Amino acid sequence: MELRDIEIFLMLAEELHFGRTAERLRVSQARVSQAIRKQERRIGAALFERTSRTVRLTDVGRQLRDDLQPVYAGLHDSLERARLAARGVTGRLRVGMMPFNLADLHFYWKEFRSRYPQWELEVRQMVYTDPFGRLRNGELDVLVVWLPVEEPDFTVGPVMLTDPRIVAVTADHELAQRTSVRLEMFADFLHTMPPDVPDYWEDGYLPFHTPRGRTIERGRPVTNAEELINQVGMGEIIHGFPSHVTRHWGMPNIRWIPVPDLATLSYALVWRTDAENEPIRALADTVRELGTFRF
């Protein structure tokens, strides 16, 4: 099996979506389909169950994923260490971002790189699916994520960003002409959240109940930002966001309305306690010294 085909298989096993797999790997969907069919012919069994709406791993696919992941990770790490050594770089810090405003936070990355040129800093935008899992499996070293985070194996570091809340609705929505929206009104409309996240963490972003105890209903879960904003644009849901997204999504059919009684989001550095190292501590110190960015 060629290395690229292994990458395609593992990415599809993670995303369970041919389009997103192609997008993340910067290949065509046809290339993804071709690679999977080739692997299935070679193995003699289906690796994925495909319908018009879902993609799921078969038992054989799950076994292959579990066997290949550590092998691929080890090979990738070996090649990466050799690449860094050739450039005189002694280490790498991989940071995953849940907020969208990478540019607003550039001064943190710039300062870190200036102070620590011996370490490569890699900052990437995260998809919604299982962000904590990416810390636990070693894909990331640090996650910038909204609080609270109450995972026993994680350390919560300094707060990098605080941001007031807004709600997104379509331009023809009954709330669209309001100057503000109360959290109590959320119970009258459908919302959504990522799948398979801890209840306390979801509640920290979008409460399950209004101040008067009414349920805030969730529809089908979403796995990425494009899917989320498309559901809003189609009028299927309304959704609470941090206010910084208005600088990155200029959509004429979407209205952004302040929600003054929805708690401000605080985003902090989070890392695995047993994986803490010098670059992680250095980034945390840099953020503490520069202070919290308040949107």
Region spans (language model):
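N-terminal winged-helix
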Residues: 29-30, 34, 73, 77-80, ...
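Hydrophobic hinge/microswitch elements
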Residues: 127-140, 146, 194-257
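A short LG(V/I)-centered, amphipathic sequence patch enriched
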Residues: 40-57
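Flexible hinge/capping segments at coil-to-helix
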Residues: 156-165, 169-191, 281
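N-terminal short secondary-structure element
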Residues: 1-35
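C-terminal effector-binding regulatory domain of bacterial HTH transcription factors
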Residues: 86, 229-230, 234, 243-253, ...
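Secondary-structure junction motif
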Residues: 104-105, 146, 179-183, 188-213, ...
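Short beta-strand-centered segments that line the small-molecule binding cleft or hinge
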Residues: 85, 107-111, 115, 129-169, ...
